[in-house]
């Protein structure tokens, strides 16, 4: 009987130790889309006034991504982070390029220890990684990041959305904001439907009576554009350039 009691006490002790060990491991952070791989450790990285954003290579695009991250961080959290080139140290965000065939073109790795090391095979992966960092940081008052290692990559090369501006004019400012929102959630394609007729059921089911809207400026037929709103060529090109900076492709049709 004494042997059995000792056996049960031993099992209970193992369960307690196991539960305590698991409790100290950080769970997978909530990110949209869901992270592919996560190996948690314990503790958290908390940015300080001395935290810098360090890009590790003489790469103009990597520097641009670092500055976009700094700008977004300032906008979202009200804290200014210095952007520098170098190796980085404890307390810093460190961005670098590193070959990894398993990650593909858009994948990335983030290791959170006493620093945050974000690496990817290509610049676009680093950019998507910054969106993940912002999403996680947004979820706590001190913008901490749980310590651990994550690897992430998309399931689909095209992650898109189509918006109908033909039947209903949508202001340019809304489209600009929409591009930024799409990029935040790693969507990379926006198809803009520019020309169409209204739904015929509202016009006696007669297509010839429906309102035909052409939303993009036309040099060949200057009077063709819709009376209730359109985009100039320059406005639309500028929108496409803005989207490119966030790795979003705009497809007009």
Where are these regions (language model features)?
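Bacterial N-terminal signal peptides that target proteins for export
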Residues: 1-9
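Short amphipathic alpha-helical "recognition" segments used for binding
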Residues: 6, 78, 195-197
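A ubiquitous, low-specificity "background" feature that marks scattered single residues
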Residues: 8-11, 170
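Acidic, contiguous N-terminal accessory segments
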Residues: 10-13, 21-154
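Feature activates predominantly on carbohydrate-active enzymes
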Residues: 102-253
């Amino acid at each position: 009987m004494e042997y059995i009691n000792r056996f049960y006490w031993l099992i209970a002790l193992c369960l307690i130790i196991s539960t305590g060990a698991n409790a100290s491991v950080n769970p997978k952070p909530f990110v949209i889309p869901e992270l592919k791989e996560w190996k948690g450790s314990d503790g958290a990285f908390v940015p300080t006034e001395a935290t810098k954003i360090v890009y590790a290579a003489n790469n103009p695009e990597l520097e641009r991504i670092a500055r976009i991250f700094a700008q977004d961080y300032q906008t979202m959290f009200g804290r200014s982070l210095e952007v520098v080139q170098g190796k980085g140290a404890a307390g810093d965000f460190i961005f670098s390029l590193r070959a990894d065939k398993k990650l593909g073109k858009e994948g990335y790795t983030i290791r959170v220890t006493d620093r945050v090391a974000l690496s990817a095979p290509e610049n676009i992966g680093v950019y998507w990684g910054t969106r993940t960092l912002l999403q996680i940081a947004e979820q706590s008052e001190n913008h901490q990041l749980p310590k651990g290692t994550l690897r992430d990559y998309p399931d689909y090369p095209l992650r898109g959305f189509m918006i109908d501006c033909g039947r209903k004019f949508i202001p340019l400012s809304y489209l600009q904001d929409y591009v930024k929102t799409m990029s935040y959630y790693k969507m990379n394609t926006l198809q803009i439907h520019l020309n169409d007729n209204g739904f015929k059921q509202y016009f006696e089911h007669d297509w010839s009576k429906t309102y035909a809207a052409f939303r993009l400026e036309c040099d060949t037929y200057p009077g063709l554009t819709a009376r209730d709103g359109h985009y100039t060529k320059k406005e639309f090109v500028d929108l496409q350039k803005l989207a490119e900076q966030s790795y979003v492709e705009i497809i007009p049709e």
